[in-house]
Amino acid sequence: MRTTIDLPQDLHKQALAIARDTHRTLSETVADLMRRGLAANRPTALSSDPRTGLPLVSVGTVVTSEDVRSLEDEQ
């Protein structure tokens, strides 16, 4: 959905930098940041691992081996 919002200049610069660094559009970046911000107010879902019975905490972000390699390459 297309909409117009006024952002403070510092937030606009930060969002543009994130978009550039992650090779995404500004719209994709702002939508992702909004989703994360809105999700932060939701309670964390707790469940139990069926094999061990230990509690599992879902933080909503899956970190893949490729993500780790990418971060290692940046260092």
UniProtKB/Swiss-Prot annotation:
GO biological process: regulation of DNA-templated transcription
Superkingdom to which the source organism belongs: Bacteria
Key words of the record: Toxin-antitoxin system
Job description of the protein: Possibly the antitoxic component of a type II toxin-antitoxin (TA) system. Its cognate toxin is VapC29 (Potential).
Protein name, entry field: Putative antitoxin VapB29
Species the sequence originates in: Mycobacterium tuberculosis (strain CDC 1551 / Oshkosh)
